[in-house]
């Protein structure tokens, strides 16, 4: 059985060591009774060491919001997987829509990052999702299949179980409301079908939903069979809000 998972991406909203410390010190105690749910945070890149120190000895996972496609070399401004390992981080966010749209990351580069993370035993949280709302399930599956085939063509089949897919339809990111619940379930089901068609064991892969997640929609979303958890954005900037989401997932999936 796949263990439920809730994560939060701080982007560049909570950027100082003091702010990050305040958030973590408030949040960690609120999660003590939810051992049936895995949690992780992608803090602002400048606060990774602070995060590592505060989360040492806890089950709260963390990692950077991006990483270089190579271990080392002339890659100015990138973040090496060697640094991730050195921090004892266990997750890395890869392929977020903002990385592709603002920084023009290519699919081939993202695929290399995924493979490198898996080879180095770091769990990649790989963001996938269509740019516009699909008209039907076939159109939705075809859009997702094109992405998955391009991103995962170089991984070993056994590595699939170490992948986390974050389904984030680009048209729902940062909006007032999430995608429709039945649409979300259709996308998650399609992703499992695609993994199976590529030879992976879809029953082992955790797929979480991200895009305007809140207390109001969390329970209905994670009640869906193929949804394993949630990827929270600005709603989780208040520690109690993040803890409430974890609680909802625990009650619904735990």
UniProtKB/Swiss-Prot annotation:
It is found in: Cytoplasm. Its main location: cytoplasm. One of its GO terms (cellular component) is cytosol. The keyword Transport does not apply. One of its GO terms (biological process) is glycerol catabolic process. Pathway: Polyol metabolism; glycerol degradation. Substrate binds at residues 9-11, 174, 212. Keywords: Cytoplasm, Glycerol metabolism, Isomerase. GO terms for molecular function: triose-phosphate isomerase activity. Belongs to the triosephosphate isomerase family. This is Triosephosphate isomerase 2. It comes from Listeria innocua serovar 6a (strain ATCC BAA-680 / CLIP 11262). The gene is tpi-2.
């Amino acid at each position: 059985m796949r263990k439920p998972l809730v994560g939060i991406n701080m982007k560049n909203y909570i950027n100082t060591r003091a702010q990050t410390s305040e958030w973590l010190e408030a949040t960690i105690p609120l999660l003590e009774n939810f051992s049936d749910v895995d949690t992780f945070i992608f803090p602002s890149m400048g606060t990774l060491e602070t995060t590592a120190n505060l989360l040492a000895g806890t089950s709260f996972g963390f990692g950077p919001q991006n990483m270089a496609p190579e271990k080392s070399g002339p890659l100015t401004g990138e973040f090496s997987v060697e640094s991730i390992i050195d921090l004892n981080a266990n997750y890395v966010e890869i392929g977020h829509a903002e990385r592709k749209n603002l920084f023009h990351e290519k699919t081939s580069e993202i695929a290399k990052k995924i493979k490198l993370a898996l080879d180095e035993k770091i769990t990649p949280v790989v963001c996938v999702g269509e740019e516009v709302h699909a008209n039907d399930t076939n159109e939705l599956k075809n859009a997702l299949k094109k992405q998955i085939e391009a991103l995962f063509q170089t991984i070993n089949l056994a590595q699939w179980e170490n992948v986390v897919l974050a389904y984030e339809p680009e048209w729902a990111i940062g909006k007032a409301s999430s995608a429709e619940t039945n649409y979300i379930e259709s996308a998650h089901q399609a992703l499992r079908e695609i993994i199976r068609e590529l030879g992976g064991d879809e029953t082992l892969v955790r797929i979480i939903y991200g895009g305007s997640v809140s207390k109001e929609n969390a329970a209905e979303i994670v009640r869906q069979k193929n949804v394993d958890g949630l990827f929270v954005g600005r709603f989780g900037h208040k520690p109690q809000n993040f803890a409430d989401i974890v609680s909802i997932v625990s009650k619904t999936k735990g």
